[in-house]
Amino acid sequence: MPHSKLILTPSPEAALPPTGQVVERLSAIGLTRETRATDVAGQAAYLAGDRFLQLITFLGCSPFVRLEPEHPDDSEFSHIRIRGPFAEPLFRSGPNTTPPRCPVCRHRYVHWRELAEQDSFNCEGCGANLSMPTLNWRQSAGTGRLFI
């Protein structure tokens, strides 16, 4: 089964609450429930809460969503992890990341991975000063200090 992810992160301007408050709030709204296990980095994995399927919509003609592990080492089910907070924003992308565009002129960056190590660069289309976070990722990648 492919590992699909939905990553949520607070806006860059938002003050980051302590992780404990994030965990409590996610549980209070019914997105999560008890901790299932910890991964090799010691980060908790939370089981889907009672309102998980009301808060997150899975599209398709007949999506199959497993909410419980079938065995102790199972990771092929829907669960929630919290990463961070990190001192500096981290860039997140995946194998299905679409090429971003310049927010000024809409120039398309097909070879965006080559730019990932640069702090800033000038747009090939209009010359605007850009960075990875300022590109229009169309919700397929982005940066953050806290990831859910």
Please tell me what each predicted stretch does.
Residues 2-10, 139-148:
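Short glycine-rich, basic-tinged beta-strand/loop micro-motifs
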Residues 35, 39, 136-139, 143:
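Generic detector of ordered, mature protein regions
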Residues 79-139:
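Cys/His-rich short segments
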Residues 1-92:
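N-terminal alpha-helical interaction blocks
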Residues 51-52, 63-65, 100, 121, ...:
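Aromatic-enriched hydrophobic runs in primary sequence
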